[in-house]
């Protein structure tokens, strides 16, 4: 047998000595394929670089020269194109098929090198791979497809704005609502936490205790007699120095009782006395005694008459005396108006005028109170006459209150020449600001009524 020739493996970078047979290229030996390992510098081919057969064996010095040339070419290409490039080279193969690393300097950790852009240039990512560049292009397309919306004035908006300006319609800023309870936060008696719920409840139940139109069912009583009785009771209330709550509750009791019971004319004053006695017991700390009312009536009624009528009224009203009167709402609405003392006196003056006249029974207590505030602001020329704060707390707009406000101003304009002058004298006092002597807001009245009263 022929002896087997053992060929020594060629050392890296050395030529074959002895003229042995050359092995296959690209590292193919003994019919086996060997993959280039990534951790020894053998990287994938760069696009556009064609493998070429070396003309001579690659020694270490020759490999260093090739490496320097490759680095210079890559640097020149990067400076011209300003693009990302992979500087790794393909593996070089010796004549005997041993792979030799044709590579640049050891590959550094992948970092993004940002070139400071000029005003007309864009930032380029030098280390971006082709796949990464495609991703960046896709993101750029998405960004171009969804640009940030900029506020631009279209032709339609410009024309609309000009039309509004020509018609006198402008977008006025919304009026701020004043917190009327801010000053009472530390006042436990003000019950700021519950005040809104309390007045919502009052608005819900105010119609339950509201008397209906009863004059038609009273054969011996008319509106004039009722006005005389209320005028006299206001005088008695002033002499006894009772609270306003007592006065308003007295009138409420009278109207509710007359709505369910027919009363002869001779007992009308007795009903008023008994109603004030009950209201005084309910509201006052030191109410007047029964004998005081006997003396006020010039002994027209006895002690027993007053107590008997008191029981009759309580039975008819089913002992219900806790009701929302116009005063309950008036106090709140005056506070919402941010008033001075003059406005406070004027609103109370107009409210008592309304209480004295039967025609105001057609309106609920909250509307009478709100209309008194509106009429007072108009009389004193407090601009604006109505605002968002008043609208919020009253629940009424200015248009909804105009009919009732005109009614109150009408009573005011005829008061000076009328015979029932107790309210006029009361609010002509300097302690009340003498608001009764001020001219009424006749511009609220219809033209015919204004000329008639003037």
UniProtKB/Swiss-Prot annotation:
Keywords: Cell cycle, Cell division, Cyclin, Mitosis. Residues 1-11 have a biased composition (Polar residues). Residues 118-147 have a biased composition (Basic and acidic residues). Pfam families: Cyclin_C (PF02984), Cyclin_N (PF00134). Residues 1-35, 108-155 are annotated as: Disordered. GO terms for molecular function: cyclin-dependent protein serine/threonine kinase regulator activity. Belongs to the cyclin family. Cyclin AB subfamily. Essential for the control of the cell cycle at the G2/M (mitosis) transition. This is G2/mitotic-specific cyclin S13-6.
């Amino acid at each position: 047998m022929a002896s087997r020739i053992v060929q020594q493996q060629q050392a890296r970078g050395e030529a074959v000595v002895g003229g042995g047979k050359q092995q296959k290229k690209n590292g193919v030996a003994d019919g086996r394929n060997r993959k280039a390992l990534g951790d020894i510098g053998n990287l994938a081919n760069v696009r556009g670089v064609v493998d070429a057969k070396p003309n001579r064996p690659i020694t270490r010095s020759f490999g260093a020269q090739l490496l320097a040339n490759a680095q210079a070419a890559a640097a020149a290409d990067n400076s011209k194109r300003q693009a990302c490039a992979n500087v790794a080279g393909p593996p070089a193969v010796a004549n005997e098929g041993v792979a030799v690393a044709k590579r640049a300097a050891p590959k550094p950790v992948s970092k993004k090198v940002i070139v400071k852009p000029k005003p007309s240039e864009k930032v380029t990512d030098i280390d971006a791979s082709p796949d990464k560049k495609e991703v960046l292009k896709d993101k750029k397309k998405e960004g171009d497809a969804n640009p940030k919306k900029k506020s631009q004035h279209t032709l339609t908006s410009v024309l609309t704005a000009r039309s509004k300006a020509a018609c006198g319609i402008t977008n006025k800023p919304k009026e701020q609502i004043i917190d009327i309870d801010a000053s009472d936060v530390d006042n436990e008696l003000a019950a700021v936490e519950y005040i809104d719920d309390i007045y919502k409840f009052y608005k819900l139940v105010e119609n339950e205790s509201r008397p209906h139109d009863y004059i038609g069912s009273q054969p011996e009583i008319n509106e004039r007699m009722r006005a005389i009785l209320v005028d006299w009771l206001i005088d008695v209330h002033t002499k006894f120095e009772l609270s306003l709550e007592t006065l308003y509750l007295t009138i409420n009791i009278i109207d509710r009782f007359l709505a369910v019971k027919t009363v002869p004319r001779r007992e009308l004053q007795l009903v008023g006395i008994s109603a004030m006695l009950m209201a005084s017991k309910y509201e006052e700390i030191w109410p007047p005694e029964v004998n005081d009312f006997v003396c006020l009536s010039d002994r027209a009624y006895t002690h027993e008459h007053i107590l008997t009528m008191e029981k009759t009224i309580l039975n008819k009203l089913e002992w219900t005396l806790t009701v929302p009167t116009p005063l309950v709402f008036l106090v709140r609405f005056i506070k919402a108006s941010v008033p001075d003392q003059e406005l406070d006196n004027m609103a109370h003056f107009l409210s008592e005028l309304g209480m004295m006249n039967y025609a105001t029974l057609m309106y609920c207590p909250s509307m009478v109170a709100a209309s008194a505030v509106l009429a007072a602001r108009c009389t004193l020329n407090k601009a604006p006459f109505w605002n968002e704060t008043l609208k919020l707390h009253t629940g009424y707009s200015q248009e909804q209150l105009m009919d009732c406000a005109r009614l109150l101003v009408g009573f005011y304009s005829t008061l000076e020449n009328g015979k029932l002058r107790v309210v006029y004298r009361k609010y002509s006092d300097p302690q009340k600001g003498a608001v009764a002597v001020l001219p009424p807001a006749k511009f609220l009245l219809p033209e015919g009524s204004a000329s008639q009263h003037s």
